[in-house]
């Protein structure tokens, strides 16, 4: 090559070098105790949103409101069981299209802090772990158990390749990825498990991505939840002393940025307890204290809570089983319906002291409509439609089998046997302690007898004759999502007995109620003749039309007891006005039809009012709690 040609090559190479954009990076700076984004000091102010609790048509509205609140990032959980409902069966369509959600965050200018689990807690069914893991009953979850690790690795090899191109280093907007979740609060304290996850995340995401952990501020939590190679962050709420809480982080991370990965703006609700609320003033003051220290904060667990549609609500275990309500409003800055609250504007004011707010107005609350009263009619008692709900027929077993043993994940299973003798004087139908998981609705000769409940009433008195049919409809109210009892098996875990004599020879019906309803049942079926009685499990149906709009609404259940609601085949979740505090269910406008009837299906479990009506309102009713005995 001659000198002129060589000179041209060198000049072209120099021009190419000058034109190349600088490498994107998001790193820890242990000298200056900060993050560095593309080499410059950086601090994020983030908020949590769970795409699985928000209908896809509302994603943009919620994210835009978060952006306009002054947030620079959102924190996002990925629930494994939402995407792998059965082993090797994956669902990333529609509301489950996590890639579309992440791409929308990027479009709106938000960074992402990703929390892909495999365990997430989040008050979500089984903490995001698939219930099919319990098909191997002796599996040790969240540990180095080879069976558990094999399932985790299989899942991560599907999920993380979708994440890698969206990492900040590769031109995306994901700046950091959490490994596991609050592992220090779990009894196993298995460092080999964390080491395995670290290796898997590095192998699938590369060496540059920032990986971190989150734990509470107690020493034992940080001891078991942290690992060299994972940056340790903490979580705490507005009631904590900020200096002391970050002092706990400094015990395990003497240098590096201060990070609160879950600053609690509110709290969750449990059935039977008062609606939780947290003062806007306290939340804003705590945020300002952290920002003055230069900390990065994820707010806000939650910034927008959303709804536990269908059967996705989890449960806690604190001396007793505590199922979470359908509403996940969380008293968050954005309400369950996505409306800005006083708390949001208090937070926004604090943020404005530390960084400029986006130019423009906050998007308004979504429109709501009170569609009014809708009359329903009884379609059928549940016992009269078992051929529809369990077309494959029952499973025979000498003793009851759990949901997991018959591979039923959510919902309901019916257990049927016969009385072995005449019972002229009331006999005790009872269950061993902790064996009703979670509620059992008892019928004898199709007559409703009452309810058995986990950590509640576990016996009823019955009379009958030899050969009378005894049915127990078992409801899974949500698997435990936090603590040591996460292997939460459902159904009848022990045998029922009659005056201490075990009952045998059961027919077990796994009910596919959602499958039938999504296929148009019962609205597309011929009318069913049914008893006029209102007690016990039964289906009720009705329709209503909207006045040319499909706006969000809230449905109230005057005189109803407990059950499940579907509109147009969409499972809106559990209602339980008798237990409270939640009195209404949120109905997103996106599930409603305009110009044609909206089909309502209700499964009432205990007893409907004599005149079955629903009332559609333009506001929620949260805070009414009656005693546990009601």
For the regions a language model picked out, list residue spans one by one.
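Aromatic- and glycine-enriched glycan-recognition loops and surfaces
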Residues: 50-68, 87-106, 280, 425-431, ...
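Aromatic-lined substrate-binding rim segments of carbohydrate-active enzymes
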Residues: 59-127, 198-209
């Amino acid at each position: 090559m001659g000198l002129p040609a060589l000179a041209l090559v060198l000049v072209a190479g120099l021009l190419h070098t000058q034109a190349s954009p600088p490498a994107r990076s998001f790193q820890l700076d242990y000298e200056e105790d900060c993050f560095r984004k593309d080499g410059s000091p950086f601090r994020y102010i983030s908020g949590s949103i769970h795409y699985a609790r928000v209908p896809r048509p509302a994603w943009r509205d919620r994210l835009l409101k978060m952006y306009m609140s002054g947030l620079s990032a959102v924190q996002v959980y990925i629930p494994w069981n939402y995407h792998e409902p059965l082993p090797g069966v994956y669902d990333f369509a529609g509301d489950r299209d996590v890639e579309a959600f992440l791409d929308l965050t990027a479009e709106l200018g938000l960074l992402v802090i990703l929390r892909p689990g495999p365990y997430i807690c989040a008050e979500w069914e089984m903490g995001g772990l698939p219930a099919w893991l319990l098909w191997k009953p002796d599996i040790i979850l969240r540990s180095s158990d080879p069976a558990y690790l094999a399932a985790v690795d299989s899942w991560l090899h599907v999920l993380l390749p979708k994440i890698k191109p969206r990492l900040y280093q590769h031109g995306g907007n994901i700046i950091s990825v959490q490994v596991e979740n609050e592992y220090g609060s779990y009894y196993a304290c298995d460092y080999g498990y964390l080491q395995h996850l670290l290796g898997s995340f590095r192998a699938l995401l590369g060496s540059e991505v920032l990986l971190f952990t989150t734990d509470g501020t107690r020493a034992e939590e940080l001891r078991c939840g942290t690992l060299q190679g994972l940056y340790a962050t903490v979580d705490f709420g507005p009631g904590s002393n900020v200096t002391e809480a970050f002092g706990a982080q400094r015990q395990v991370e003497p240098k590096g940025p201060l990070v609160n990965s879950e600053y609690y703006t509110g709290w969750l609700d449990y059935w039977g307890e008062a609606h939780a609320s947290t003062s806007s003033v306290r939340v804003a003051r705590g945020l300002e204290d952290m920002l003055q220290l230069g900390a990065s904060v994820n707010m806000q667990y939650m910034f927008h809570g959303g709804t536990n549609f269908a059967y996705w609500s989890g449960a806690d275990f604190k001396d007793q089983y505590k199922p979470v309500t359908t509403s996940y409003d969380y008293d968050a800055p954005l309400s369950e319906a996505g409306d800005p609250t006083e708390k949001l504007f208090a937070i926004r004011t604090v943020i404005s002291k530390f960084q400029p707010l986006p130019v423009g107005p906050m998007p308004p609350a979504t429109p709501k409509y009170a569609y009014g009263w809708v009359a329903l009619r009884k379609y059928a008692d549940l016992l009269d439609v078992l051929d529809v709900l369990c077309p494959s027929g029952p499973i025979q077993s000498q003793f009851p089998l759990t949901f997991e043993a018959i591979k039923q994940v959510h919902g309901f299973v019916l257990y049927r046997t016969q009385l072995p003798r005449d019972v002229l004087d009331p006999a005790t139908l009872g269950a061993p302690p902790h064996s009703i998981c979670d509620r059992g609705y008892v019928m004898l000769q199709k007559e409703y007898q009452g309810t058995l409940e986990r950590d509640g009433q576990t016996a009823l008195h019955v009379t009958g004759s030899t050969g009378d049919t005894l049915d127990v409809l078992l409801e899974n109210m949500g698997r435990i999502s936090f603590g040591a009892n996460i292997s939460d098996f459902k159904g009848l875990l022990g045998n029922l007995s009659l005056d201490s004599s075990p009952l045998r020879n059961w027919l077990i019906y796994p009910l596919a109620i959602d499958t039938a309803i999504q296929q148009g049942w019962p609205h597309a079926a011929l009318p069913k003749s049914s008893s006029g009685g209102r007690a016990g499990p039964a289906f009720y149906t009705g329709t209503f039309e909207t006045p040319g709009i499909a706006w969000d609404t809230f449905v109230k259940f005057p005189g109803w007891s407990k059950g499940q609601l579907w509109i147009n085949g969409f499972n809106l979740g559990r209602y339980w006005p008798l237990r409270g505090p939640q009195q209404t269910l949120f109905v997103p406008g996106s599930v409603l039809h305009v110009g044609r009837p909206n089909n309502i299906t209700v499964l009432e479990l205990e007893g409907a009012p004599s005149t079955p009506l629903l009332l559609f309102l333009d506001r929620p009713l949260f805070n009414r709690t009656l005693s546990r005995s009601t």
